[in-house]
């Protein structure tokens, strides 16, 4: 396949999305070897090039048509789109789907001694952030004026360093805020990782490959959310047992050798099978209950 037909995918070089992005692509059957000294990795089995770049470069690379796909946090994507619209630059891309990793929230936080009532408590104060556009949009909607302090990292130390009165930063568990004497006050944006596509993809072969990769991603994500359930059940309580299986659709029911009073049930559940459900199944006479993870799903 010619160089122009090779699919170019941008992912974060290092950081919280990097490992999960590579794990996802490998789960989709994309084989590649990463050389930490190189920014480009070529797939061994598919016409795909992997570009490892800074996360805040990914949206622009996709929007400008430099790469075809990007795996990025929704917060970074939204921040870049707002900035490009403000500068009247191309800001369109196709969001193919949200992914099941990279969950975080962009929140306002203030020092523990700060008497916070609502967002208006920040009127006229200085707020440190790496996401000035998302912060500005939120504060404008609230009708609050403030001064911003733009930092590319270590935002959480700004109040102690005397640089700002509060911060607007990404929060996962809140442990970093607590360690720096801060507490979370408002969530202004919730984010997951997502996969985006350039609006400029035109070659049929490349679009077909994108659809193949997306289908595999859908299968991997569905498999993570599903469990394969096997059990033996008395025929007299079969309907009750099937009704208890969460998210099960048309389970397979098979006869057991030399036992006309019991059957085997195989089912895919798209919900968690909790212990209390398993105990209810047991009360109805179910036995040999197995709940197993699924690696891949299709169809």
Swiss-Prot record:
UniProt superkingdom: Bacteria
UniProt key word Glycoprotein: no
Biological process (GO), any one: L-histidine biosynthetic process
EC number: 2.4.2.17
Subcellular location: Cytoplasm
Functional pathway: Amino-acid biosynthesis; L-histidine biosynthesis; L-histidine from 5-phospho-alpha-D-ribose 1-diphosphate: step 1/9
One example GO MF annotation: magnesium ion binding
Catalytic activity from the UniProt record: 1-(5-phospho-beta-D-ribosyl)-ATP + diphosphate = 5-phospho-alpha-D-ribose 1-diphosphate + ATP
Regulation affecting activity: Feedback inhibited by histidine.
SUPFAM superfamilies for this protein: GlnB-like (SSF54913), Periplasmic binding protein-like II (SSF53850)
Cofactor(s) in the UniProt record: Mg(2+)
Keyword Transcription: no
Keywords annotated in UniProt: Amino-acid biosynthesis, ATP-binding, Cytoplasm, Glycosyltransferase, Histidine biosynthesis, Magnesium, Metal-binding, Nucleotide-binding, Transferase
Cellular component terms per the entry's GO annotation: cytoplasm
Family stated for the protein in its record: Belongs to the ATP phosphoribosyltransferase family. Long subfamily.
Annotated function: Catalyzes the condensation of ATP and 5-phosphoribose 1-diphosphate to form N'-(5'-phosphoribosyl)-ATP (PR-ATP). Has a crucial role in the pathway because the rate of histidine biosynthesis seems to be controlled primarily by regulation of HisG enzymatic activity.
Listed PANTHER family: ATP PHOSPHORIBOSYLTRANSFERASE, ATP PHOSPHORIBOSYLTRANSFERASE ATP-PRTASE
Protein name: ATP phosphoribosyltransferase
